[in-house]
From Swiss-Prot:
Organism: Neisseria meningitidis serogroup C (strain 053442)
PANTHER family: ADP-RIBOSE PYROPHOSPHATASE, DIHYDRONEOPTERIN TRIPHOSPHATE DIPHOSPHATASE
Coiled-coil ranges from the UniProt annotation: none
Keywords: Hydrolase
Family, similarity comment: Belongs to the Nudix hydrolase family. RppH subfamily.
Keyword Hydrolase: yes
Protein name (database record): RNA pyrophosphohydrolase
Function (record text): Accelerates the degradation of transcripts by removing pyrophosphate from the 5'-end of triphosphorylated RNA, leading to a more labile monophosphorylated state that can stimulate subsequent ribonuclease cleavage.
Domain Nudix hydrolase: 6-149
Lineage: Bacteria, Pseudomonadati, Pseudomonadota, Betaproteobacteria, Neisseriales
Keyword Chloroplast: no
UniProt EC number: 3.6.1.-
Cofactor(s) annotated in UniProt: a divalent metal cation
Length: 174
């Protein structure tokens, strides 16, 4: 299901622990890492889609998390044409996402990457809050930065800024 501009409605999930570290998932049989995300089905609310994706990708149930907040508006990224399925070229541009910030209220052992028959991730770790911006595939970087900035400024008081984090990193990591 695409909107008029060719974007697929989607939710992104930033799951944090008590140290404000983020869940960082390794995609199955790939060397790429990302936040959990997934499409919104017709008739499904963003919040319902978020809980479905949280279970499908991370194996967590609503009782394992607390919603801290969400982005006010859709954040969009374009997918490079060589990443788009041939049959979608010309109509599909990318994803538009509502991002949720969740706090894990359960335990690390509640995470179950094999909760469904088609796992998205085959590994995971807790990661510094801002580190994913520099590690995610390039075409998603602006959306990751926008979501992390908006959610930290609105809901995580005292969080180090991305600019301060980036200034502390070795120059080869930016």
């Amino acid at each position: 299901m695409l909107d008029r501009e060719g974007y697929r409605p989607n939710v992104g999930i930033i799951l944090i622990n008590e140290r404000n570290e983020v869940f960082w998932g390794k995609r199955v049989r790939e060397h790429s890492w990302q936040f959990p995300q997934g499409g919104i089905k017709p008739g499904e609310s963003p919040e319902t889609a978020m809980y479905r994706e949280l279970y499908e990708e991370v194996g967590l149930l609503p009782q394992h998390v607390k919603i801290v907040g969400r982005t006010r508006d859709w954040l969009r990224y374009d997918v490079p044409n060589n990443w788009v399925r041939r049959e979608w070229r010309g109509s599909y541009r990318g994803q538009k996402q509502i991002w949720y910030l969740l706090r894990l209220t359960g335990r690390d052992c509640d995470v179950n990457l094999r909760a469904t028959r088609h796992p998205e991730f085959d590994g995971w770790r807790w990661h510094q809050y801002w580190a994913p911006v520099d590690e995610v595939i390039e075409f998603k970087r602006d959306v990751y930065l926008g979501a992390l900035k908006e959610l930290s400024s609105r809901f995580l008081r005292g969080m180090e800024s991305y600019e301060d984090f980036a200034a502390r990193q070795p120059s080869g990591n930016r």
